[in-house]
């Protein structure tokens, strides 16, 4: 299959300046997004960025862990998001196994993502151990967002789903410095203690984005499914602002009832 390349629009590309620390004078706000229709809605919500996250592994594809999603699966989703929100700053996660092996592999993957989706930047997990990969991708001309603290792709190595920074604060602090020095334009801190996140935010020069990392990061990011109530699990740091799952179920049941009772379709539902 021949795959046409897409070039990011100048509008999306220039918005990376919004991530310069303190340039907005307010918190940056972002959500994950996985499809065209949702992207179209979110494009009018004054968000600073959208992330096509590898969290799609569970919430979209139904895999048991984040590491199961493959590159093509992420790329297909990201291309739809870019089409739905053409003027948004869109970041795409590099899936597990697509960048760790070598600088060359990391660069190839990052460039493929940008060329095939038209996204603005990529995100990868890992601090000091991935600094070389970040530097290589940045040198190749692709903006990189880092990700430290709890890193879902390596959940087994972290000993499960738990808060980071209680007994490894020094290592996470060094990770933040390494990501900054490698040339990342921002860094996600996931499930990091609030005090550590506050310290890191005050001492590094790149923008920090918190995911369950307290009140003092430069910005906040959540999985949209958690925010709108379209996920089975309730996450402590992600309050539900709606219950879309219940709304959808109610609509479907009402429509089914109308069909069975002969109330659908009515005359105005029939094409002329």
Curated annotation (Swiss-Prot):
Keywords: Cytoplasm, Magnesium, Metal-binding, Pantothenate biosynthesis, Transferase. The active site is at residue 190. Its EC number is 2.1.2.11. It is an enzyme of class 2 (transferase). It is found in: Cytoplasm. The keyword tRNA-binding does not apply. One of its GO terms (cellular component) is cytoplasm. InterPro entries: Pantoate_hydroxy_MeTrfase, Pyrv/PenolPyrv_kinase-like_dom, Pyrv_kinase-like_dom_sf. SUPFAM superfamilies: Phosphoenolpyruvate/pyruvate domain (SSF51621). Its cofactor is Mg(2+). One of its GO terms (biological process) is pantothenate biosynthetic process. The keyword Magnesium applies. Gene3D superfamilies: Phosphoenolpyruvate-binding domains. It catalyses: 3-methyl-2-oxobutanoate + (6R)-5,10-methylene-5,6,7,8-tetrahydrofolate + H2O = 2-dehydropantoate + (6S)-5,6,7,8-tetrahydrofolate. Pathway: Cofactor biosynthesis; (R)-pantothenate biosynthesis; (R)-pantoate from 3-methyl-2-oxobutanoate: step 1/2. Mg(2+) binds at residues 54, 93, 125. 3-methyl-2-oxobutanoate binds at residues 54-55, 93, 123. GO terms for molecular function: 3-methyl-2-oxobutanoate hydroxymethyltransferase activity; magnesium ion binding. HAMAP family: PanB. Catalyzes the reversible reaction in which hydroxymethyl group from 5,10-methylenetetrahydrofolate is transferred onto alpha-ketoisovalerate to form ketopantoate. Homodecamer; pentamer of dimers. This is 3-methyl-2-oxobutanoate hydroxymethyltransferase.
């Amino acid at each position: 299959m021949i795959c046409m390349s897409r070039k990011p629009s100048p509008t999306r590309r220039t918005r990376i300046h919004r991530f310069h620390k303190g340039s907005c004078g307010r918190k940056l706000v972002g959500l994950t997004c996985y499809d065209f229709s949702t992207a179209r809605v979110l494009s009018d919500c004054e968000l600073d960025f959208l992330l096509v996250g590898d969290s799609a592994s569970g919430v979209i594809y139904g895999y048991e862990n984040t590491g199961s999603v493959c590159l093509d699966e992420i790329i297909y989703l990201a291309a739809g998001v870019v089409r739905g929100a053409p003027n948004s700053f869109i970041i795409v996660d590099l899936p597990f196994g697509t960048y760790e092996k070598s600088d060359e592999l990391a660069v190839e993957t990052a460039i493929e993502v940008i060329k095939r989706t038209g996204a603005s930047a990529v995100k990868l997990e890992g601090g000091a151990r991935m600094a070389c990969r970040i530097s290589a991708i940045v040198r190749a001309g692709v903006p990189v967002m880092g990700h430290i603290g709890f890193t879902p792709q390596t959940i087994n190595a972290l000993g499960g789903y738990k808060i980071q920074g209680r007994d490894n604060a020094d290592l996470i602090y060094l990770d933040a410095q390494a990501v900054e020095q490698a040339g990342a334009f921002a860094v996600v801190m996931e499930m990091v203690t609030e005090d550590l996140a506050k310290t890191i935010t005050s001492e590094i020069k790149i923008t920090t984005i918190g995911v369950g990392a307290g009140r003092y990061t430069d910005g906040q990011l959540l999985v949209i499914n958690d925010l709108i109530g379209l996920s089975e699990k309730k996450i402590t740091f992600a309050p539900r602002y709606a219950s879309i799952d219940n709304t959808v179920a109610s609509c479907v049941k009402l429509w089914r009832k109308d069909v069975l009772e002969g109330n659908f379709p009515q005359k105005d539902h029939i094409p002329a």
